[in-house]
Amino acid sequence: MTNKIYNLDKTNIKDGVQCIKKLWFNFHEPIIIKDNPEFHKGERFGLIVRENYGNGLDLSDNFNIQDVVIKTEEALKSKNTNVIYEGAFIFEKTLVRTDVLIKNRDGWDLLEAKATTKIEEKKNVLKKEYLLDLSIQTFILKQCGVNLKNI
């Protein structure tokens, strides 16, 4: 059994809101799907996001969560880092990974990038699950002391 530095992550929380049994199975009988097409679609979309926001610290290929948390903390303090891709934050043993953090004049902007093929009729309305996603990230980042200015 591995000794994880976190118990919950954003996906577990969202799954638990959707269905408590799903959360239970995620913890007690997890299924690991290595060739999930959705995962690969997300990888490709991540490349497009990085092309649009330019050079920055890209932590997307690092799956050692403790290492990613440390590198994210260092990048937040660095004067040379303006963009962080796939940063990691842990508060109260709850993990979130952010898609993009962009340094602005007096803090950081949080960008949640979504790869979707559905076109919403109401263009300016965020889907409920996106709001939950951003709410979880915002709470954890603020608890970790990140000065968020725009979400």
Provide a role label for each language-model segment.
Residues 1-107:
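Metal-dependent nuclease catalytic cores that hydrolyze phosphodiester bonds in DNA/RNA
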Residues 76-151:
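Mg2+/Mn2+-dependent nuclease catalytic core
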